């Protein structure tokens, strides 16, 4: 794991920390920054590699509007940015968008495997899965409708999608994702606590 501390400008000095594991008090105590520094924590995710990140930022009270904008502009270069006012929410952010790409990769992997058992060639199963995921994500991004509304629009009564979605619901997909995100959040808290104790 790599840590990046970027000095934005002086005066007053401010620092952007891209290290999902360390809370701001830990960063101050373990570095030369000191207790009065204006600190912004950020949690980007791996799609930053293709300028498609979902990055969340948290600022300490010492950060002024200009410093917030400079920090955000750095992260906007690699994708979407959002702010949270409570640093504790960074653990939930880690669980959702930080670890989230792996969840989608797993779902796509499972869909590809299922398609192959139905007889589709491996490459066809892969491409159809990827394009379907891309198309659904793009529709959701470009629509003002909620995910639930979009789902209902493609779920015809008595049709194939309705039956398929019923299987997912009966299998407890919502509870499964609740446990999934809670497990990731709890692990994020454990890691931060462990680092703070060292």
Stretches with model-predicted labels:
Residues 96, 108, 194:
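Catalytic, metal-anchored helix/loop core of enzyme active sites in primary metabolism
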């Amino acid at each position: 794991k790599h840590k990046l501390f970027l000095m934005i400008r002086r005066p007053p000095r401010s620092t952007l920390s891209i290290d999902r594991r360390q809370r701001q008090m830990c960063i101050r105590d373990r570095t030369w920054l000191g207790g009065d520094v204006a600190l912004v924590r950020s949690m980007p995710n791996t799609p930053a590699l293709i300028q498609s990140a979902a990055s969340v930022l948290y600022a300490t009270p010492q950060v002024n509007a200009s410093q917030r904008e400079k920090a955000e502009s750095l992260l906007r270069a690699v994708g979407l940015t959002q702010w949270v006012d409570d640093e504790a929410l960074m653990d939930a952010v880690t669980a959702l968008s930080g670890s989230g790409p792996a969840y989608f990769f797993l779902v796509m992997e499972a869909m590809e495997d299922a398609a192959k058992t139905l007889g589709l060639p491996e490459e066809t199963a892969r491409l159809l899965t990827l394009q379907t995921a891309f198309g659904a994500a793009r529709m959701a991004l470009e629509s003002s409708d909620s995910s639930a509304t979009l789902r209902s629009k493609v779920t015809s009564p008595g049709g194939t999608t309705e039956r398929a979605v019923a299987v997912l619901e009966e299998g407890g997909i919502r509870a499964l994702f609740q446990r999934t995100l809670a497990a990731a959040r709890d692990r994020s808290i454990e890691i931060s606590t462990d680092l703070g104790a060292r």
